[in-house]
Amino acid sequence: MSSPPTRYTRNPQLRRPSLSTPTPPPPSSSSTAPASSSATPIPDDAPDADDNDGSPPSPDLPLTMSASVMLTQLPRDATAALATAGEFPADQKVVVRFKPVGGSAPALRKELCKISAAQRFEAVVAYLRRTLKVGNGESVFLYINSTFAPALDEIVGNLHRCFKDSNGQLNVSYSMTPAFG
């Protein structure tokens, strides 16, 4: 009787040894074989059923909001969203702490003040000028956190939201002469 022919499976590491001479299995490298059987499988690049046109596959492109079938309605217009983004309720107040900088600025009796969050920073300047009794020809310089001078059209609520201290107060430093920058 002759020995049966040697048969190979698709994986050369899983071949059946012949009956005549035992051969050791080929050495396995830890870098080529996965360490565990729970390794993620490699996705095949087989074309989908809907790719019948014969063209090469195109990369996945993001869908626009109007082309998506998952959305039940389109989001609000960006301008409408931005118009309401900076609005504050009329009854919301912001606590402002006034600090004099330098020797030329007089101290206030009440350094804490509540101002409506919807008002512009020019209302803070007008309040301070009125409280200090500053004339029309004199200047007052205001700074947030002793760092920068905001524009007069900034909303006080936005400044408070971005620059309030750990006590929830907006620190406004003031001087009769330029103090910072």
From Swiss-Prot:
GO biological process: autophagosome assembly; autophagosome maturation; autophagy of mitochondrion; glycophagy; piecemeal microautophagy of the nucleus; protein transport
Keyword DNA repair included in the entry's annotation: no
Cross-link named Glycyl lysine isopeptide (Gly-Lys) (interchain with K-162 in ATG5), sites: G181
A GO CC term attached to the entry: autophagosome membrane
Subcellular location: Preautophagosomal structure membrane
Domain of life where this protein originates: Eukaryota
GO MF annotation terms: Atg8-family ligase activity
Residue ranges, annotated region (Disordered): 1-64
Keyword Oxidoreductase assigned: no
Keyword terms: Autophagy, Isopeptide bond, Membrane, Protein transport, Transport, Ubl conjugation pathway
Biased composition (Low complexity): 29-43
Biased composition (Polar residues): 1-12
Membrane-protein topology: Peripheral membrane protein
Gene3D superfamilies in alphabetical order: Phosphatidylinositol 3-kinase Catalytic Subunit, Chain A, domain 1
Family, per entry: Belongs to the ATG12 family.
Quaternary structure note: Forms a conjugate with ATG5.
Function, as annotated: Ubiquitin-like protein involved in cytoplasm to vacuole transport (Cvt), autophagy vesicles formation, mitophagy, and nucleophagy. Conjugation with ATG5 through a ubiquitin-like conjugating system involving also ATG7 as an E1-like activating enzyme and ATG10 as an E2-like conjugating enzyme, is essential for its function. The ATG12-ATG5 conjugate functions as an E3-like enzyme which is required for lipidation of ATG8 and ATG8 association to the vesicle membranes.
Protein name: Ubiquitin-like protein ATG12
Organism: Pyricularia oryzae (strain 70-15 / ATCC MYA-4617 / FGSC 8958) (Rice blast fungus)
Gene symbol of the encoding locus: ATG12
